[in-house]
From Swiss-Prot:
GO terms for molecular function: kinase activity. The phosphoenolpyruvate-dependent sugar phosphotransferase system (sugar PTS), a major carbohydrate active transport system, catalyzes the phosphorylation of incoming sugar substrates concomitantly with their translocation across the cell membrane. The enzyme II CelABD PTS system is involved in cellobiose transport. It comes from Geobacillus stearothermophilus (Bacillus stearothermophilus). Its main location: cytoplasm. GO terms for biological process: phosphoenolpyruvate-dependent sugar phosphotransferase system. This is PTS system cellobiose-specific EIIA component. The gene is celD. Residues 2-100 form the PTS EIIA type-3 domain.
Length: 108
């Protein structure tokens, strides 16, 4: 069983990985590598899903009567995760945008 701190660090790890994959997806799309961009977005999604699972476990623990421990590290982890989710959502939009721009320039 993981300790509370280990769980918090796992949130940070998966959030950071998800954000990194999302940023790499934007870079790939900018180069016209759309299949790679979509693959990277899927990896970002998998990382963020893992983080969400950890977050859900913490919420269930609190809902079943466990006392929540709110440390600065936990606040940082939650901020890190929410930022990563936003970056992933925006990255998906960027990939679509770069793909549309590529189609427009090849049709012209």
């Amino acid at each position: 069983m993981q300790t509370y701190e280990q769980t918090v660090f796992q949130l940070i790890l998966h959030g950071g990985n998800g954000r990194s994959y999302a940023m790499e997806a934007i870079t790939a799309a900018k180069k016209g590598e759309f299949a790679e961009a979509r693959r990277l977005l899927e990896q970002a999604g998998a990382e963020l899903q893992a983080a969400h699972g950890l977050q859900t476990a913490l919420l269930q623990q609190e809902a079943s009567g466990g006392q929540p421990v709110v440390t600065l590290l936990m606040v940082h982890a939650q901020d890190h995760l929410m930022t990563a989710i936003t970056v992933k959502d925006l990255a998906a939009e960027f990939v679509e945008l770069y793909e549309a721009l590529k189609r427009q320039t090849t049709e012209s």
